[in-house]
Amino acid sequence: MNIRPLHDRVIVKRLEVESKSAGGIVLTGSAAEKSTRGKILAVGNGRISENGTVTPLDVKVGDVVIFNEGYGVKKEKIDGEEVLILSEADLMAVVG
């Protein structure tokens, strides 16, 4: 995948969510939840402060994160794969 996010943005591949209920019933359509976990594929250089310094991001390629799929999230298809372009502010936690 040849993509480089700018500034405080990251490229995330959504991880699959378990599609069975606790009772073993396979969930489909709207009953199946979209995962809010993903793997970081690429990271921008960092946030640019008011005085022009660049602050590196707190995440790195390979991290598994929990994200908020809000207003600023951009869905794209890159090399046939759906990825999300998020700002670091949309990331809520690093898992593990």
UniProtKB/Swiss-Prot annotation:
Record bears the keyword Nucleotide-binding: no
Keywords, alphabetical: Chaperone, Cytoplasm
Record-linked Gene3D superfamilies: GroES chaperonin
SMART domains reported in the protein's UniProt record: Cpn10
Subcellular location(s) per record: Cytoplasm
One GO MF term: protein-folding chaperone binding
Protein function: Together with the chaperonin GroEL, plays an essential role in assisting protein folding. The GroEL-GroES system forms a nano-cage that allows encapsulation of the non-native substrate proteins and provides a physical environment optimized to promote and accelerate protein folding. GroES binds to the apical surface of the GroEL ring, thereby capping the opening of the GroEL channel.
NCBIfam families in UniProt: PRK00364.1-1, PRK00364.1-2, PRK00364.2-2
Subunit comment: Heptamer of 7 subunits arranged in a ring. Interacts with the chaperonin GroEL.
Name of the protein described by the UniProt record: Co-chaperonin GroES
Encoding gene, per UniProt annotation: groES
